[in-house]
Each structure stands twice: as structure tokens, then as C-alpha cells.
Curated annotation (Swiss-Prot):
A GO term from the CC aspect: host cell plasma membrane
Positions occupied by motif Cholesterol binding: 561-562
Lineage of the species this protein comes from: Bacteria, Bacillati, Bacillota, Bacilli, Lactobacillales
The protein's role, per its UniProt record: A cholesterol-dependent toxin that causes cytolysis by forming pores in cholesterol containing host membranes. After binding to target membranes, the protein undergoes a major conformation change, leading to its insertion in the host membrane and formation of an oligomeric pore complex. Cholesterol is required for binding to host membranes, membrane insertion and pore formation; cholesterol binding is mediated by a Thr-Leu pair in the C-terminus. Can be reversibly inactivated by oxidation.
Transmembrane portions of the chain: 260-273, 280-289, 358-367, 375-387
Compartments in which it is found: Secreted; Host cell membrane
InterPro entries: Thiol_cytolys_C, Thiol_cytolys_C_sf, Thiol_cytolysin, Thiol_cytolysin_ab_sf, Thiol_cytolysin_sf
Family: Belongs to the cholesterol-dependent cytolysin family.
Subunit-level organization: Homooligomeric pore complex of 35 to 50 subunits; when inserted in the host membrane.
Main location: secreted
Designated name of the protein: Streptolysin O
Region feature Disordered, mapped onto this chain: 30-108
Length: 571
């Protein structure tokens, strides 16, 4: 316990010594100041009574305080004195900040962007799939069916200028937005360039608004531009919609589906949208088990355009430097883009799917989409009766037809026709946008290049040959055919087949059935009769090559030795 008290006492002593040292320095400083004052006023103080030295009083008081502190249990606290930033330094910093904000980098921005060196097609080139190895043909036997799956390597090149908008990118695809022309842009995942901007004028093409259709957005951020567009639309509904109808602007595209990259290039839409909303079974398509067509209907209610700049720097605040743009990704490999317009409306995606192996599937689907009466065409009607249809609406009153799955294509037609008029209850949705290169206002089109495998499947059904001999003569037959299969590399393997009774003499009446597998091809049927003539002992009655495989092939011979008759009919 005594050790604790001793430690506590010495701690106070150390603290008091530190305090005394500080006080001593202050006393010394005061004494020097008093000496200077005494020298200047010596003549005026000779008659005054002498005063005790301030240092002695201070020392005496300090000693008393020291004793009091030593005998006290209170802790000694010393607070360091903060040294404030000199006002001159503050003013200098303010001055520098103001100077930077007032510097005009317009000329620098123009010079640097104009000097960017790039090829528009190369920076926006999108290379899809590259097909190296695939099995060109495959044969699948199922009961009395033989399915031939044929694959052909194809390629597609497109350069669309209107790019589909998905929800995840609306905040970087609005009118007057700045983007980078890089890989992200080609994949519909554009990188935004966010910086201080000049005011921007935008225009909406709703009818009847006149000059009111153009407004200026002081700070063209996504939020501010969206608010300005909403205000324009509401203004149109309130004041101009009564006597005006919107012009019908519908874009329609269709394509058979073979792969993700192929359908993206063909329809200019992100395959994730189609896969996520329509549920495309790409695996079954590649196997030839299903055939799928996608149709996209784009109905544009209105378009919002941003005024194109005369010079690149027109879109930036004068304080923006090219170094700042470089830090945000601008380069020869990723030049800046400017969103020139955005189309608002709704999109209807329709999926037509069938397991039919008919070669007329694409024609049947196209006829249905175009409104052709397919009931008069038996082949088309059969295909559509064995198909399913799915429609998904993006934009408009999507809640009414969010997703429709049906076997009746008339239901799909109604989905396309319904809610085709723009109103408050049927609002528009950003569906596509167009960007231009900031350097020269050239339209930025994604150069899609992709290879894909076009898969077609043809189904063959087994058949039979019905032989019937009713002629007044001795007859002989030769029935030949090939059976087709494919090895694991897709190479055709041909097996020669023949009827066991070839060249056997048959007298009338005679009939038999020769079964043919579903993979039978190159069928040859020959029948001859014995004339009894020495110079023409045998005469051919039938000699047909490449007889098509059918459910029933009826081969009939009749007549006399000098007037034989033969025919082949199909059932």
C-alpha cells in the first residue's frame, strides 16, 4: 500500500515539475518584455515606489501550488494547445480552388478528342462463337422412326445501330449519356463516363407540342433527364393528347434459333432477355429435338433525342480536363460515345416451338406470324397444331400480358394487338437507343460477327413394299436398297440390302410384303416378265431407281406376255 502511495506522489511530482517548467518559461518571456518597456519609460517612473519582482511572486505562488498539489488526490491534466491553420494559408487554398474552377479546358478537350486515333468498326467489333468441331450428321433410331440430324456451319454479320435496352443499363443509356466504345458496349453493358457537364437540350417527338417539346436540362444526369422526360410526357397527356393520335411505328423481325450468339445478332437483342423470359432450350435445339422461332415486335410510342454537339467539348463543363476523362477510361481503345436518342414504347417477344421434324416448320411459323390463314395448308396446319407459343410483353401495361403460354396462336395475335395505343394506363418503356462517337457524331453500330451451327432434323418413318403379280407370265424381281447410318464423326455409313427372292421366278398370282427400315434410301425396284420370244426372252415391266420411302409402296404387274403392264403407287 505504501508503494502505491509513493508511486502516486512521485507521479504528482513529475507532473508538477513539468508544469513549473512551463510556468518558468512564461515568466522569463514576461521579464524580457518588461525590460524593454522599462527602457522606453525610464524618465516617467523615477518618482514611483519600487514594486516587488514579478518572478519572485510567481515563484512563491508556484511553490504554494506545488505543495497543494502534492497533498491533493486530484489528477493533473495537461491539455495540448491546438495551433490553428494560418488565415493566409486558408486564403491561398481558396484562391487555388477558385482558379482551378475558372480555368477553361475547352480547347484542350477538343484537341485531345479530335486527335484520338481509332477504327469505328474495330473498337465496336463483337466476335461471337467460333465453330471448330461439330458432327455434321447424326442418325437416331426411335421405334419405327429414323431421325437424321444435320448440322451446317454458318456465319452472320450484322451492324445494328439501335441497341436493345435492358433494365440493368437504363441509368447509362438515357438521352445525352456519355459512354465508352469498348467491349462492354458491344455486350450491352456500357460503361458510363460521369463528370461535370454543360446544360443539355432534349426533344420529345410527341405530336402537337411544338416548341414545348424541347427543354434544357441544366445538369444532364440520369435522374435529371428522366425527370425532364416525365414532365414532358405529363404535359402532353394534360394538354395535347386529346386531339392527337400517335403514328404507328412498329418494327418486326423474326428468326429461327440455332445458338445464343446467332439469335443475338439476328434480332439485335441480348440473349439473356430471351432466355430469361421465354425459356429457350438451346440444348434441345442443338440436338435437333426442337425447332424454335423468335419474333420481336417493337412498337415505338415516342423518341427522345439529345441535341448533337458541334464540338466534343460542348458537352463538358469548362473545368473538365482530358486527364480526368483518361482516368475514367477514355482512350484510343475506348473513345467516348454520346447517346443521341432513346426510343420508348413496348416490345413483344413471341416464341414458336415445335418438336416437328418437318422441313416446312420455318415456313409455317412465318405464315402464322404474318397472319396467313394456315388452315387451308394441311402441312402448315399439322405443324402448328403440334406447336406451343409463348408471348412476353416488356413495357406498356405489361401486367395484363406479362407472359402468355398457349397452344392457340390467335391468343398471341390478340396480345400483339392489345394495348397498342399510348396512354397513362399504358406507359412507354425504354426499348432501344442509338449512340454516336463524340469525335464526329458518327453512329456507333456494333459489328456483330459470329459463327453458328444450323441444325435441321428430318424424320423418316419405316415403310414397306407390297408386291402383287397378276400377269399371264412368269415374273422375276430385283429389289435393292441402302440402309444409312452415321459414325461418331458424322460420316455416312451405307449398308447394301437386297430382297432374298431376287431373280426367283414367280407365277401368277403372287404377292408378298417387304419391310423397309426408316433409314432405307436409294430404293430400286425392277420387275421383268418372260415373253417366250427367242430374241427377247425377258422384258422389263418396271425399272425404277430412287423410289422414295413411303408408308406403303405398292408394286403391281399384270397383263400378258406381249402386253405387260406395271405400276408403282404410294400410300
Amino acid at each position: 500500500m505504501s508503494n502505491k502511495k509513493t508511486f502516486k506522489k512521485y507521479s504528482r511530482v513529475a507532473g508538477l515539475l513539468t508544469a513549473a517548467l512551463i510556468i518558468g518559461n512564461l515568466v522569463t518571456a514576461n521579464a524580457e518584455s518588461n525590460k524593454q518597456n522599462t527602457a522606453s519609460t525610464e524618465t516617467t517612473t523615477t518618482n514611483e515606489q519600487p514594486k516587488p519582482e514579478s518572478s519572485e511572486l510567481t515563484t512563491e505562488k508556484a511553490g504554494q501550488k506545488t505543495d497543494d498539489m502534492l497533498n491533493s488526490n486530484d489528477m493533473i491534466k495537461l491539455a495540448p494547445k491546438e495551433m490553428p491553420l494560418e488565415s493566409a494559408e486558408k486564403e491561398e487554398k481558396k484562391s487555388e480552388d477558385k482558379k482551378k474552377s475558372e480555368e477553361d479546358h475547352t480547347e484542350e478537350i477538343n484537341d485531345k478528342i479530335y486527335s484520338l486515333n481509332y477504327n469505328e468498326l474495330e473498337v465496336l467489333a463483337k466476335n461471337g462463337e467460333t465453330i471448330e468441331n461439330f458432327v455434321p450428321k447424326e442418325g437416331v433410331k426411335k421405334a419405327d422412326k429414323f431421325i437424321v440430324i444435320e448440322r451446317k456451319k454458318k456465319n452472320i454479320n450484322t451492324t445494328p445501330v439501335d441497341i436493345s435496352i435492358i433494365d440493368s443499363v437504363t441509368d447509362r443509356t438515357y438521352p445525352a449519356a456519355l459512354q465508352l466504345a469498348n467491349k462492354g458496349f458491344t455486350e450491352n453493358k456500357p460503361d458510363a463516363v460521369v463528370t461535370k457537364r454543360n446544360p443539355q437540350k432534349i426533344h420529345i417527338d410527341l405530336p402537337g407540342m411544338g416548341d414545348k417539346a424541347t427543354v434544357e436540362v441544366n445538369d444532364p444526369t440520369y435522374a435529371n433527364v428522366s425527370t425532364a422526360i416525365d414532365n414532358l410526357v405529363n404535359q402532353w397527356h394534360d394538354n395535347y393528347s386529346g386531339g392527337n393520335t400517335l403514328p404507328a411505328r412498329t418494327q418486326y423481325t423474326e428468326s429461327m434459333v440455332y445458338s445464343k450468339s446467332q439469335i443475338e445478332a439476328a434480332l439485335n437483342v441480348n440473349s439473356k432477355i430471351l432466355d430469361g423470359t421465354l425459356g429457350i432450350d438451346f440444348k434441345s435445339i442443338s440436338k435437333g429435338e426442337k425447332k424454335v422461332m423468335i419474333a420481336a415486335y417493337k412498337q415505338i410510342f415516342y423518341t427522345v433525342s439529345a441535341n448533337l454537339p458541334n464540338n466534343p467539348a460542348d458537352v463538358f463543363d469548362k473545368s473538365v480536363t482530358f486527364k480526368e476523362l483518361q482516368r475514367k477510361g477514355v482512350s484510343n481503345e475506348a473513345p467516348p460515345l454520346f447517346v443521341s436518342n432513346v426510343a420508348y414504347g413496348r416490345t413483344v417477344f413471341v416464341k414458336l416451338e415445335t418438336s416437328s421434324k418437318s422441313n416446312d416448320v420455318e415456313a409455317a411459323f412465318s405464315a402464322a406470324l404474318k397472319g396467313t390463314d394456315v388452315k387451308t395448308n394441311g402441312k402448315y396446319s399439322d405443324i402448328l397444331e403440334n406447336s406451343s407459343f409463348t408471348a412476353v410483353v416488356l413495357g406498356g401495361d405489361a401486367a395484363e400480358h406479362n407472359k402468355v403460354v398457349t397452344k392457340d396462336f390467335d391468343v398471341i395475335r390478340n396480345v400483339i394487338k392489345d394495348n397498342a395505343t399510348f396512354s397513362r394506363k399504358n406507359p412507354a418503356y425504354p426499348i432501344s437507343y442509338t449512340s454516336v462517337f463524340l469525335k464526329n457524331n458518327k453512329i456507333a453500330g456494333v459489328n456483330n460477327r459470329t459463327e453458328y451451327v444450323e441444325t435441321t432434323s428430318t424424320e423418316y418413318t419405316s415403310g414397306k413394299i407390297n408386291l402383287s403379280h397378276r400377269g399371264a407370265y412368269v415374273a422375276q424381281y430385283e429389289i435393292l436398297w441402302d440402309e444409312i447410318n452415321y459414325d461418331d464423326k458424322g460420316k455416312e455409313v451405307i449398308t447394301k440390302r437386297r430382297w432374298d427372292n431376287n431373280w426367283y421366278s414367280k407365277t401368277s398370282p403372287f404377292s408378298t410384303v417387304i419391310p423397309l427400315g426408316a433409314n432405307s434410301r436409294n430404293i430400286r425396284i425392277m420387275a421383268r416378265e418372260c415373253t417366250g420370244l427367242a430374241w427377247e426372252w425377258w422384258r422389263k415391266v418396271i425399272d425404277e431407281r430412287d423410289v422414295k420411302l413411303s408408308k406403303e409402296i405398292n408394286v403391281n404387274i399384270s397383263g400378258s406376255t406381249l402386253s405387260p403392264y406395271g405400276s408403282i403407287t404410294y400410300k
